[in-house]
Each structure stands twice: as C-alpha cells, then as structure tokens.
Amino acid sequence: VYDNFIQASRIAEHKDVRLPIMICQDGFITSHAVENIELLEDDKVKAFVGEYNPEQYLLNPKMPMAVGPYATSPFYMESKMNQNEAMKNAKQVILDVADDFAKISGRQYGFFEEYKLEDADYAIVMIGSAAGTTKEAIDALRAQGKKVGLLKLRVFRPFPGEEIAKALAHTKAVAILDRSEGFRAGGGPLSAEIKEHLYDIGASTKAVSYIYGLGGRDYTTVEATDVFNQLEEMIEQGKTIPQYQYIGLRK
C-alpha cells in the first residue's frame, strides 16, 4: 500500500492519463495489523513524486474552459471515448512509473506477482492479503511434490487481461478467488475478467470461480489446500465439481 501510494500520483497526473486512481487495502485484516515496513526518505519520495504542473490552468483568459460540468448527449460519448483512451495509456505508464520506483527503492512491481507459477499445473488467482495464506499452502504442497502456484493481481483497472491469460495458459486449471460477489450468479468480477481473456487467447486452461472471505471471514491454508485438491481431482480424476462455489460457508 505504501509503495503503491507513492507511485499513484505520478500515474494519475501523467499527461496521457489524468484519471482518478484508487489504492485498495484489506480493511481490518491488514489496516489494523502491526508489521514492519521499509520507509523511504522524505526527500527521495518528494523528488520522485514531483510537482504537478497542469497543462491548462483554471483561469486563463486566452483559453477559457469549463471544469466539472456534466456532459450532455452531443458530447458525452466523446468524453467517454477519451477516458477509455486514457485508461489504455495507463497500462504503459504504470509499468514506466514502477521501473522508476524500483530505482529509488529496489522494489520492482508489475501488473501482478507470480509465485511458483512458472511450472505450475494448478494455480490460484486472487487479490490482496490472502495471497500470503495461499503462499503457505503452496509451500506445503510443493514439499509433497505437487506443482501449484499463485498469481496475485496488483492492478485491476486497466485490467491486464492478455498478460494474465498468457501467464496462466500453461496451467491445467486455475481457481479464481473473488473477495466480492458479482451478483451475476456465476462468480465475482475477477472471475469474469480472467475467463474472458483465457477464452480470447484460446487457452485450454479450465477455470473455476470461488467466493471467499466476505465480511472479513478468515481464509485458511486448509481451505487453500482444498481448492488445489479440487482442481487436481477435476483434471486427473475427471471429477465434477461446482464451477461457482463459496469457500468456508457455515453449514
């Protein structure tokens, strides 16, 4: 969260983007926890973020402009198209800013983090702090000789769909874990995005949708292990499993 906040201003204020940006953190689970972090010196952060120099100022008699009014139908679609172009531009800006941040911090970021994914047959895809729990389960399963891995998403918008699909294309099956309900009777928002892009590149990877941790409910290594076992049984034994299910429901 700390590192992402430092990068956020540079991304949002870039002349090719100029869009709002949100940094999301697991409420209570990490926001009320105590953990060591490595802070950067203030002067380094200030130099990295820099000063915002707008291309146009609010009061300019030579170029009068309106800021903040709603767009009516003659202009609305064009404004939406411009926002979409800015969102496309944001992908490269995010990577460029991350490269610059790595130079002052030694910490490199991309659209997502891969954990033991390069040779994995089965993978979990998720966002947020629960990835740490999944990593513990992966380490234990790897010790048993099982090829499992994790893809932890860092950037949700613009969605790096093609990059994620290519990173997962070699796997036999993936479990997509959403900590939010999409209310479409078929999985959460992350699930919908990833399945679409796996289809687009023609990947043979099977994808199963899961919902977990709603309302801050705990997610355990036992549950992560069970998800991996379900994927393996589906592929290796031909077992039919629900393609959309909740983890950790009270019976």
Segments and roles (model prediction):
Residues D178-K251:
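Peripheral docking tails and interdomain loops at the edges
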Residues F159-E162, H170-R179, G188:
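Active-site cofactor/cluster-binding pocket
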